[in-house]
Amino acid sequence: MIDAKEGLFYGKSEKGFGKRQMKNWENVRLVREFSDQGVDCYKLAGGDYVNEYYVVSEAETRKLMNTPEVVGYEVYHCLIPATSQMLFYFKEQKKVTTANILSILRGALNYPLEESCYREHIRVHDISFLSSERVFQEDEIAGLEIKYSKLTMVPDSTLMIGDIIASGETLIHCLRYVTDFYRAHGAKLRNIIIFTIGGTKGIEILEKLTSEIRE
């Protein structure tokens, strides 16, 4: 979870923080945050992170991770219990009140954010959409370009994103696009919550991106 209490993001910016602190993985540990309704949640501690990171485990998420045959709608269905329980936790912790869901097409279709918000009685103010595609020059990838954009500005809301982080380039491009959009309109986000299937690469990307956005 990325906090955003001052400006867009909370706390002081420190150039290069993301790259430097990633050397300290040996100090990182999982601390149990809660165990409820069959969902176990652990918080990453000891890494001196800019953001908050949680690892969630539940029977259906373990099935998803360990069974390559799980595809299509079943992927979406497997993520509902853990996503819903995490949103309940965030609501209890006062970390989310009104949600604005950002759907990064097409990966976001695997994440049950709207349904989970409905189950946990979290108001979804609106859903925004972005589509980012690779730009090629002479048969080589030259960058990314936003091909479709339908953004709704909801000041002081929680921006929720569900996306699988591989290289992270799409997420980086879209997050910069959204934060620039809010800045251009003089608006602020309360925080950003990202649900993802990813590893340490995702944490490194988000730490570095947060520091860059603060500069």
Predicted regions and their residues:
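PRPP-associated nucleotide enzymes
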Residues: M1-E215
